[in-house]
Regions:
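Short, small/acidic-rich helices and loops at N termini and domain boundaries
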Residues: 1-87, 362, 367-379
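Glycine-biased, small-residue-rich flexible motifs in mid-sequence functional cores and linkers
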Residues: 2-6, 82-379
Length: 379
């Protein structure tokens, strides 16, 4: 990704301590662009409500940290996704206090596809790890992207189950993406980069800090249609994620466990508070599939307005697009890249259409990122 003037401006803001979404919203209402904000004097920015430290950091950023971020962005797989970027996930934008910039390693398109968060205890039981893996496999095979926080225990089990099937998974981190925390998950993080995405609101060079992880948890829930808590003690950080999900109007699911297990007490509390008790991935799919399909169709209808013929109904244009995609698939396994070449659509368009077809039971996903039509081949 190039470090254009606008991107450089966003980096100035991302590196400024104490600049939150609310303050940036006020600034954008007063100035025409990020570049114009960065060209103001410190006193002008302070009149807009910023502290002296934040204002000075915007107009005169730390040269070393800025250079580090710019070098990081020269890698093809590294991205800076800002509020006004086409790839900024709309579901996260809907959430309160969403970060104004995301650093991403891997495929940023995944952030806008339907996701389910799977979270839980770092000190998970063997049964908890097995359960997280089982749910992650079933949910990813049903077309959802599994999102978690790259922590040990439940998070790692959910990510690993997806990676082992070559399914996409999103890991939200509480550090800069030039480092992995915990270090034990370096190999897992490298695998996620290849088939999914690593995400952080923190720029390169930022070390782990206890205050970062609640912010990470808010992004996890904000990206997701729902949050599943597999195992959690009464003070588990997973309960923070579930709390954010509820605040954001998202679904909260919890798996019950033994009344004698400390790692079940958090889930039992959530269920008492109204979380949906689930025993199988099908319970979640039944609840979230209609939302996933509706959001994807809404996204597609917005883009389709620009491409469809005059006076042709949007629904008709969308249906024609699906018919074209199914015809291009044929009856043999095919990859997303193969369909992009056959249809002339973007990878994002093909991916979202495939997800809808999968949720509707018309196609199935196979190993190696391939898809195939279900049913009987027409003669």
């Amino acid at each position: 990704m190039s470090t254009s003037t606008q991107v450089a401006g966003w980096l100035h803001l991302a590196l400024a301590p104490g600049l939150g979404p609310a303050a940036l919203t006020r600034l954008l209402a007063s100035f025409d662009s990020v570049t114009e904000i960065c060209n103001q004097s410190a006193s002008t920015l302070m009149e807009g409500g910023l502290s002296a430290a934040t204002a000075n950091a915007i107009i005169d950023p730390d040269v070393r940290r800025l250079a580090m971020a710019e070098r990081w962005l020269t890698h093809d797989a590294h991205h800076l996704i800002c509020w006004n970027h086409v790839d900024y996930p709309p579901l996260l934008k809907d959430a309160a206090q969403s970060p104004f910039a995301l650093f991403v390693v891997g495929n940023p398109v995944l952030l806008s596809l339907p996701q389910i968060a799977i979270v839980g205890s770092r000190s998970a039981t063997a049964n908890g790890v097995e359960t997280a893996s089982l749910f992650a496999r079933h949910l990813s095979n049903s077309g959802f992207t599994v999102t978690s926080g790259l922590a040990l225990g439940i998070d790692s089990a959910a990510h690993r189950a997806c990676v082992e099937q070559s399914k996409p998974t999103v890991a939200v981190c509480g550090t800069g993406l030039d480092r992995v925390y915990p270090a034990k998950n370096a190999t897992l993080a490298a695998a996620i980069e290849q088939c999914g995405a690593l995400v952080s609101e923190f720029p390169p060079g930022v070390e782990p800090h206890k205050d970062h992880f609640p912010r990470r948890n808010r992004i996890i829930s904000g990206l997701s249609l729902g949050t599943l808590v597999v195992e959690a003690g009464i003070h588990s950080g997973a309960l923070i994620t579930a709390g954010y999900a509820a605040e954001q109007g998202r679904e909260v699911f919890a798996i019950p466990g033994s009344i004698h297990s400390p790692q079940s007490k958090g889930c039992h509390r959530l269920i008492k508070q109204g979380a949906k008790l689930v025993e199988a991935a099908a319970d979640i799919i039944e609840e979230l599939a209609p939302q996933a399909i509706a959001r994807l169709r809404e996204t597609q209808s917005g883009g389709e307005e620009l491409r469809r013929e005059p006076n042709k109904p949007a629904d008709s244009a969308i249906t024609a697009g699906y018919e074209k995609l199914l015809a291009a698939m044929g009856w043999d396994p095919v990859s997303v890249d193969g369909l992009v070449k056959r249809c002339g659509l973007t990878a994002a368009e093909v991916s979202s259409m495939l997800l809808i077809l999968e949720l509707e039971g018309q196609i199935e996903s196979l190993s190696g990122g391939r898809y195939q039509r279900k049913g009987t081949k027409q003669q």
